[in-house]
Swiss-Prot record:
Organism of this sequence: Lactococcus lactis subsp. cremoris (Streptococcus cremoris)
Name by which UniProt lists this protein: Bacteriocin lactococcin-B
Biological process (GO), any one: killing of cells of another organism
UniProt entry tagged with the keyword Protease: no
Main location: secreted
Keywords: Antibiotic, Antimicrobial, Bacteriocin, Plasmid, Secreted
A GO CC annotation given for this chain: extracellular region
S-S bonds: none
Role this protein plays: Kills Lactococci by dissipating the membrane potential of the cells.
Propeptide: 1-21
Amino acid sequence: MKNQLNFNIVSDEELAEVNGGSLQYVMSAGPYTWYKDTRTGKTICKQTIDTASYTFGVMAEGWGKTFH
């Protein structure tokens, strides 16, 4: 499917060059990772693992611990 809205996908490094800051890793919890924008000081949350993969991973880990 063609991108009809003409969005450009940029990496964090490219975005840092455009806005004058960079994203610094803060922490990860579950399928989410938090970054801090060094220019604005705002904390940004990105989902870095899809929900289904994370859920199945948690279930598999629990089953593995239960039956070991």
